[in-house]
């Protein structure tokens, strides 16, 4: 997310770190680089102009205390203005209805149907509530089939009637949700190839009938600045409460995220970060700005760890590390928990200063992880608890059982030995373990 833009901005800001004073002369080239980076990321020209003017004005007008590095102050100004550009503060969902209703709208191809399933999954996991999906796209049978399939995958009920009146379907779905004690109703409306009066009239009728707590517009981030016109077109007819930006995980410039709030006054509430059904994140401007500038996102990292890692198991492993008893059984357990967190390269990007440490470009081959797991599982419990007993004949057996080579078994044992030594140093130095 925002990787290309982040690289450009970080490179530009790196140049001011050593300056003893901020002057118009020594920041002019850097401001030009920031301007170009934003424009090339497809940020709206008007937004770029206002952003750079504000940053420059604040930087030159700040009284710098002797204890503060001017370069650090400039970076703080840039970050604060980025946060403001992205929406200032995160805007929570209004879920006060009984049941609360959320209406998702958008053009065809924006990822609306997949997004509504992701959102239902998000609400169920994060808030432990019972969601109901509603199929109101009666013009595309494939859309109803897709929603039913997604609902089946997630074990979330999909309400559909097969009628041709989406307003009636939405109304009946609310009554059904009340009768069956559903907490949230998520309405998947019909998409169009472009905004037209027929689409808008239908959406307005659903809105007037259901009176949803949230009306979220799903937008493909790869649309670039055309997305602004789409948001404006919908917002002229419907009181949008938020935007969901999809496909921010792909090779997209992401500039629309920096333009939406400033130009339309509609907040970004969610972003799609992967194609998986758990690939939807609540949008937080402060965290997003930190990630753009390479400051990491520790809060997200902790949240992911809290969701995925078994606390008791982690405490048990930590205790064994501190006692110097960490073995391959513990290693296997730890690896399985780390796998739950998602791709390791994505986690590394959340660590502050990861780019400077050169760890953001690390590529972890899933096949290699599978080989490691197979090797450890091919050992006997005794061998996992006492790796020192694994000699030549045992290595040959383990390699054959795991479909790998003796060289790979040797490599794993060497890496495990290095890891144990490192852990011993950490615990001797009273360093806290990251879980």
Stretches with model-predicted labels:
Residues 2-19, 189, 287-435:
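Long amphipathic alpha-helical segments used for membrane anchoring, targeting, substrate engagement
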Residues 9-136, 143-163, 169-179, 183-189:
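Primarily NTPase-proximal linker/entry elements flanking Walker-type ATP/GTP-binding cores
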Residues 16, 42, 78, 107, ...:
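Residue-level signature of catalytic and energy-coupling elements of molecular machines
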Residues 36-40, 57-60, 83, 87, ...:
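Generic secondary-structure signature for well-ordered alpha-helical cores
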Residues 138-139, 163, 189-191, 221-222, ...:
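Conserved Walker B
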Residues 141-147, 227-230:
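Short, glycine/polar-rich helix-capping loops at beta-to-alpha or helix-loop-helix junctions
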Residues 170-174, 182, 194, 198-208, ...:
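Conserved phosphate-handling catalytic cores of large alpha/beta enzymes
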């Amino acid at each position: 997310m925002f990787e290309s833009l982040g690289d450009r901005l970080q490179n530009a800001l790196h140049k001011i770190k050593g300056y003893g004073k901020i002057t118009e002369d020594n920041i002019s080239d850097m401001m030009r680089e920031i301007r170009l980076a934003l424009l090339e990321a497809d940020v709206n020209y008007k937004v770029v102009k206002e952003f750079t003017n504000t940053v420059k004005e604040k930087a030159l007008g700040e009284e710098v205390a002797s204890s503060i590095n001017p370069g650090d102050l400039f970076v703080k100004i840039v970050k604060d203005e980025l946060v403001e550009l992205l929406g200032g503060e995160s805007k929570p969902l209004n879920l006060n209805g009984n049941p609360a209703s959320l209406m998702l709208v958008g053009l065809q191809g924006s990822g609306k149907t997949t997004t509504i399933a992701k959102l239902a999954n998000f609400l169920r996991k994060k808030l432990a509530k019972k969601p109901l999906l509603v199929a109101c796209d009666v013009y595309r049978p494939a859309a109803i089939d897709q929603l039913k399939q997604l609902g089946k995958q997630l074990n979330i009920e999909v309400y559909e009637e097969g009628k041709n009146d989406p307003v009636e379907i939405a109304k009946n779905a609310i009554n059904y949700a009340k009768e069956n004690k559903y907490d949230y109703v998520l309405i998947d409306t019909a998409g169009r190839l472009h905004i037209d009066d027929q689409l808008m009239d239908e959406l307005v009728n659903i809105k007037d009938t259901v009176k949803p707590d949230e009306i979220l517009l799903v937008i493909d981030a790869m649309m670039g600045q055309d997305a602004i016109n789409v948001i404006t077109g919908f917002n002229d007819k419907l009181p949008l409460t938020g935007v969901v930006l999809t496909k921010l995980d792909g090779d997209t410039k992401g500039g629309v995220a920096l333009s939406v709030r400033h130009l339309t006054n509609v907040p970004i509430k969610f972003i799609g970060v992967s194609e998986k059904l758990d690939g939807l994140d609540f949008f937080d401007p402060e965290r997003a700005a930190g990630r753009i500038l390479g400051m990491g996102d520790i809060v997200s990292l902790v949240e992911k760890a809290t969701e995925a890692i078994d606390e008791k198991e982690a405490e048990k492993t930590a205790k064994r590390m501190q006692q110097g008893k960490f073995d391959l059984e513990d290693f296997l357990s730890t690896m399985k928990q780390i796998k739950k967190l998602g791709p390791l390269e994505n986690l590394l990007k959340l660590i502050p200063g990861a780019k400077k440490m050169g760890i953001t470009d690390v590529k972890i081959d899933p096949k290699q992880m599978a080989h490691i797991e197979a090797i450890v599982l091919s050992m006997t419990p005794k061998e996992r608890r006492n790796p020192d007993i694994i000699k030549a004949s045992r290595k040959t057996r383990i390699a054959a059982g795991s479909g790998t080579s003796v060289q790979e078994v040797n490599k794993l044992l060497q890496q495990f030995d290095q890891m144990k030594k490192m852990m011993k140093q950490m615990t001797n130095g009273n360093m806290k373990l990251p879980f």
